[in-house]
């Protein structure tokens, strides 16, 4: 598991800049020296993870583990810490979410977090593709990494 206090703090702060307009997100990026790629700049849903992490560090003094969990909660990345995975998954399957497969994903998240990451990342990428939205490279890399881990695990249990 992970520290429940850290998870709670990350959960409270992870969307602290989400409601800001793109122009404000870009100003925060400039203020904190955040370099954004073209996919992030075109999508404030992704941009708020980076700016939120910086604001959480600067204004609330969160430790690096919480800052990183906030930073990666929208795209994911390969080899995430337990806290990073918990926040990513909690955000993806929160009670207000209603999409095909969310109930299965919620059950899986409580029993096998890495398997939930594989399924959640696949679902996210399929949803983006269906909507004609370019997925972030980190999300694709995360899925490839977790699928590789799944295959490694299968080899060790044969």
Predicted segments, located by residue:
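Divalent metal-dependent catalytic cores for phosphoryl transfer on phosphate-bearing substrates
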Residues: 2-121
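Charged phosphate-binding loop/patch that engages nucleotide di/tri-phosphates or the phosphate backbone
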Residues: 126-158
């Amino acid at each position: 598991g992970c520290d429940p206090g850290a998870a709670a703090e990350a959960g409270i702060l992870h969307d602290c800049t989400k409601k800001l307009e793109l122009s404000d997100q870009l100003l925060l990026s400039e203020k904190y020296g955040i370099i954004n790629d073209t996919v992030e700049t075109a999508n404030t849903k992704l941009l708020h993870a980076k700016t939120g992490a910086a604001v959480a560090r600067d204004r609330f003094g969160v430790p690096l583990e919480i800052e990183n969990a906030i930073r990666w909660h929208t795209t994911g990345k390969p080899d995430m810490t337990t806290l990073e995975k918990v926040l990513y998954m909690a955000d993806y399957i929160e009670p207000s979410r209603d999409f095909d497969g969310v109930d299965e994903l919620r059950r899986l998240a409580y029993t096998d977090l890495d398997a939930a990451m594989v399924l959640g990342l696949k679902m996210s990428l399929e949803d983006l593709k269906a909507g004609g939205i370019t997925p972030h490279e980190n999300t694709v890399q995360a899925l490839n990494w977790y699928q590789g881990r799944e295959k490694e695990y299968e080899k060790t249990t044969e």
